[in-house]
């Protein structure tokens, strides 16, 4: 009897994991085309989340466009043209729904709270008014976070799965 070949349960195929993105972003490396920040100032969670989602969308669109151009070039017996890949990537990105890639904001905040519990990020003390406070003044401000020394020294495998690092 033959056993069917199928992927293992769980997980999603991502260009970069959420934890790895957070670390690289807060280090100021600007992963996936995101803006480079000052590591000492840090960034608020909403900005990190937005850059993560946009980066995943850009990477996915570029990957899809590359595959389409490869197929077209193979069928047409021609070489791959990078200009076509860029045009296709822009078309795919313009049609892609914002919610189609990555996690939702609440899941991201829970993920950050795990990273904070591990002591890998800390608030910088810098706060600014949030858009929510325009309508509800007692609402929470935008708090900036940065990496701690423990966060910089944590292993790559721990950053890939902070829940395992936290709960074992």
Regions found by a protein language model. Give the residues of each.
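Residue-level marker of regulatory loop/turn positions in helix-turn-helix DNA-binding domains and
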Residues: 14, 18, 100, 104, ...
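Short, solvent-exposed secondary-structure capping/transition elements
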Residues: 61, 120, 156-157
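Intrinsically disordered, low-complexity acidic Ser/Thr-rich regulatory segments
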Residues: 77-106
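Short amphipathic alpha-helical interaction segments
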Residues: 99-125
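Residue-level detector of family-conserved "landmark" positions at structurally sensitive sites
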Residues: 125-126, 165
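Accessory beta->alpha helical hairpin/"wing" motif in late/C-terminal subdomains of nucleic-acid enzymes
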Residues: 126-140, 144-152
């Amino acid at each position: 009897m033959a056993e069917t070949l199928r992927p293992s349960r769980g997980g999603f195929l991502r260009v970069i994991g959420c934890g790895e993105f957070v670390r690289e972003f807060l280090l100021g490396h600007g992963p996936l085309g995101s803006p480079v920040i000052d590591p000492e100032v840090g960034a608020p969670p909403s900005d990190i989340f937005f850059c993560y989602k946009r980066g995943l969308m850009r990477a996915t669109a570029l990957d899809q466009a590359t595959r389409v151009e490869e197929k077209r070039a193979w069928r047409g017996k021609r070489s791959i043209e990078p200009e076509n890949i860029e045009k296709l990537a822009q078309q795919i990105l313009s049609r892609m729904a914002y919610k189609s890639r990555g996690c939702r904001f609440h899941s991201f905040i829970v993920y950050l709270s795990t990273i904070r519990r591990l002591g890998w990020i800390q608030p910088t003390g810098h706060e600014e008014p949030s858009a929510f406070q325009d309508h509800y003044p007692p609402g929470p401000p935008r708090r900036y976070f940065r990496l701690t020394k423990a966060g910089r020294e944590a292993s790559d495998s721990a950053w890939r799965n902070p829940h395992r690092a936290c709960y074992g």
